[in-house]
Amino acid sequence: MSTFERNSSAPPELDDIGVNLPAPADFSTALAEGFARRIGTLARRGGASGEAVKWAARAAFAASRATAEGHVCLPLAVLARRFDASSAEVRAALFASGMASDGSQSAAALRPLVVDGQGRLYLARYYDYERRLARSLVAHAGVNAGASAGVDADATAQTLHERLLRYFGPQQDDEVDWQRVAAVMALSGRLTIVSGGPGTGKTTTVVGVLACLLDARADLRIALAAPTGKAAQRMQEALLARAGDLPPELAARLPQTSYTLHRLLGSGPGARFRHHRDNPLPYDVVVIDEASMIDVAMAAHLLDAIAPQTRLVMLGDKDQLAAVEAGAVFAELSARPAFTENGLQRIAEALGIEAARLSEALPDASGGFDEGPDDFFAQTGAPDDFDTPLDDVFDDADAHGAFGGLPGDDLFTGTTVPVAEIGRAHV
């Protein structure tokens, strides 16, 4: 049973088809009721049958409430069970109402509700956010996405190893150093997700990565950002505090300010951000802290604004500070990763350890994490078998190749990453 099914009141019927609505318990419920009435009215005006109108209203209420609770979508089966109906019956009624699309249409052509091929019910806006995000992730992490600032595709494992020694120091013990693993991946890919709890060294890792990049290219344009002003300030202070360990000439090149995501993207009086696909951010490297707070809408806008050649590093704790709005994007993207033999070998060579040793310390594909990676782990890109509506997008875009990770290597298999809906509805 889903969280939505346990916690939500049953979708109401419309007053004007003979069923009284309960008094709204809160604003989101009132909003859902108003939306349900509107969808029912539009369906009836369009000539839909009474049964189709009723299901359109029920679905509108359920989708709106799910979004208010942080879910991007919910299984149609959840709604069907409430009224002892089958998913097939509900799907047919929704399409007959004229208020639902199957998701194959362009954003402008979507109806208010979307029922995808896997039986998930969306508000059209959130379906489009998720679809845009999926396509942007595939395009940005793709090995053929074009030259990437600071991505040293021709760097040998020895070069990477020397840079790690220079800016991370020598290996301290026999344990796998996950900061170094994260650094190798961040130095070798356009999209890197770094998840770890407080004190696991995310900031130290970023400082080292930026030092390695600036050492290779002194004129890199770097931006630091976070979802809130307080988080952005903390990130800036932590980075500058650790910059004292760097050579002065490198420390001086680190960014001296940070931004909120809205300021970074250029929020203004209009509905659209100033930076988007047609006017991308003018940076070579963008580092986002507290990324677990980013919802699916902001993630879609952010990826739209990242130029193909720009490196994006996202830091956060997948177990804390969930997004306020719908879509726990960071938690989904930092789910259990898996690596191919080529990828393991390249990372191991850069670290100066045996590939077998690294492999043994990696997350257990059957479900759990070993102690080390659970505390600190990084991955590039995202898997190709998102068990979600993103699945079709990734399949169409050849995501297995797109998320090869390190240039020239099939680093990230993605075949053992059971990522559920982008959102908190894991059913």
Task: Identify what each model region corresponds to.
Residues 2-426:
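Conserved ATP-binding/catalytic motifs of P-loop helicase motor domains
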